[in-house]
Design a protein with these regions (language model features):
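Helicase P-loop NTPase motor core of nucleic-acid translocases
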Residues: 1-473
Length: 473
């Protein structure tokens, strides 16, 4: 017990593009029932993947071994709308933290390290599986569009008017607008672009701040649908639902599918079909190489060190526009991820090797055929470029340069900056802040740093440093 509150379980919440919600809310019974069935099946397939890949527990002194568990237990709760009352069918998959260890049948807890790390990948897998299942059932086609109010790309069903998507995305629009405002505000204060991790933090902060309370008495689903149809008449009176459904169902596509006896060949054969279908030059190997390179580049843009799950999540995003047989989906995505990881530098050393004939011994072997003391899901990777940049940075600590402000010039510029701040009603630098800023501006070193605890004014200090540097260079 380290003093932290115990974790009873995990709430995995599904999501889908708004066009699916629109068709579910306003479609005929056959359409609604079909979407419900696809959502149920996508949730089941996602949990199966989660169980097979990440639902493990720990054993040994200090939990040194990551060992297999006999699946997970939980409940699925269906919700039908957003906090703003817009149609948004989704499921809360509440997974118990208690699992039975396969090796000795003792009841233990899930390995939370892997649960938290894999959540983005699990979400991406579910989103792709749902779209695959809907295409399998209805033949619907999809187009990747920029989400209104954000830079995110969303795969929407062709034929669903953007007017409807926007009209029934009230909470999403509210969050997106506030997130954009806070990002711009922070970038103006710091003088630099907000990174992906900070954007995610801002998004979560805004989501919590704008979250409305649920009504004490939930309306029935029929009452909700009546409300949606009334709102439809108010916000989009010119849209005819029957015509929309005809437009949606008039567009048909097919899934990529391969029948193969040997599972090892499926990814290669399927990628060959995929390369042909998307009119890409070359065969499966060339496509796999290109997607692997793209996968790594996107991962590097967001991380300097990553795990396999980060690369798998990016592979799922790369394949967002491609509809694949749902039973083969993760095989294709993970084949790209494995190829990408082969181009990485593994930072976690290999220390143990399973003895011959030990693959079935769950006390020392995982279901994936690895030893329990070296969990591949926890291995860390980077690239040679990142390592070279790290070495360059370290070497730069001992280098000097001729650029920057001469001794005394930095302080003079900061004095003028303080006067401008006072005149504008802003906050000038305190003496210790100005001393730190002058040090950064006048230091002959190629790399220098300012260190201070939270709340001591580092952001304001660096704002002055940034403006001083931009004024000269």
């Amino acid at each position: 017990d380290n003093g932290e509150a115990p974790v009873a379980g995990f709430d995995l919440t599904t999501r889908q593009p708004k066009s699916i919600s629109i068709l579910w809310a306003f479609g005929d019974k056959e359409t609604r029932d079909g979407i419900d069935e696809c959502m149920r099946k996508a949730a089941e397939m996602t949990i199966d993947y989660f169980e097979n890949e990440y639902a493990t527990t720990r054993a040994g002194q200090g939990g040194v071994a990551s060992v297999a568990a006999d699946g997970v237990a939980g409940f699925a709760f269906d919700h039908y709308d957003s906090r703003d009352g817009d149609p948004q069918p989704h499921k809360h998959l509440v997974i118990s933290n208690r699992v039975r260890r396969s090796s000795d049948k003792m009841w233990t807890a899930l390995d939370g390290r892997k649960i938290y790390a894999s959540m983005v990948e699990i979400s991406e897998v579910h989103e792709n599986l749902l779209q695959d299942l809907l295409t399998e059932r209805f033949g619907w086609t999809w187009t990747l569009k920029q989400d209104t109010g954000t830079k995110a790309m969303v795969n929407e069903i062709d034929g669903v008017p953007q007017e409807l998507i926007d009209a029934f995305s009230g909470r999403h629009a509210e969050i997106a607008k506030e997130v954009e405002r806070k990002i711009k505000e922070e970038e103006q204060q710091t003088g630099k672009e907000v990174g992906p991790r900070r954007k995610a933090q801002i998004d979560l902060e805004v989501w919590k701040k704008t979250r409305k309370a649920k009504p004490e008495i939930q309306p029935s689903l029929k009452a909700k649908r009546d409300h949606w149809f009334r709102k439809l008449g108010e916000v989009a009176p010119g849209i005819q639902i029957d015509q929309m459904l005809k437009d949606v169902n008039s567009r048909k596509t097919r899934l990529l599918h391969v029948d193969a006896e040997c599972e090892d060949d499926i990814a290669r054969l399927l990628l060959g079909q995929l390369a042909d279908l998307t009119q890409l030059a070359g065969g499966g190997d060339e496509y796999l190489d290109r997607q692997a390179r793209a996968d790594i580049q996107k991962t590097v843009n967001a991380h300097t060190v990553w795990k396999r799950t980060n690369v798998r999540a990016e592979a799922e995003r790369l394949l967002r526009e491609v509809r694949i047989d749902p039973t083969q989906r993760v095989i294709v995505a993970n084949a790209i991820a494995d190829k990408a990881l082969g181009q990485c530098v593994k930072l976690t050393p290999d220390r143990y090797k399973l003895p011959d004939g030990a693959l079935d011994d769950l006390s020392i072997a995982t279901r994936q055929g690895q030893n329990v003391f070296e969990d591949a899901d926890l291995d860390q990777y980077t690239t040679a470029d990142v390592l070279e940049a790290e070495q360059y940075m370290i070497a730069s600590l001992d280098k000097t340069t001729g650029i920057g402000y001469k001794p005394g010039q930095g302080n003079q510029w900061l004095d003028q900056w303080n006067e401008r701040m006072k005149a504008q009603g802003g906050y000038p630098l305190a003496p210790d802040q100005q001393q730190a800023a002058a040090y950064a501006l006048e230091s002959p070193c190629l790399v220098s740093s300012i260190i201070g605890p939270a709340g001591t004014g580092k952001t304001t200090t660096m704002k002055a440093v940034s403006q001083a540097w931009q004024a000269r260079y």
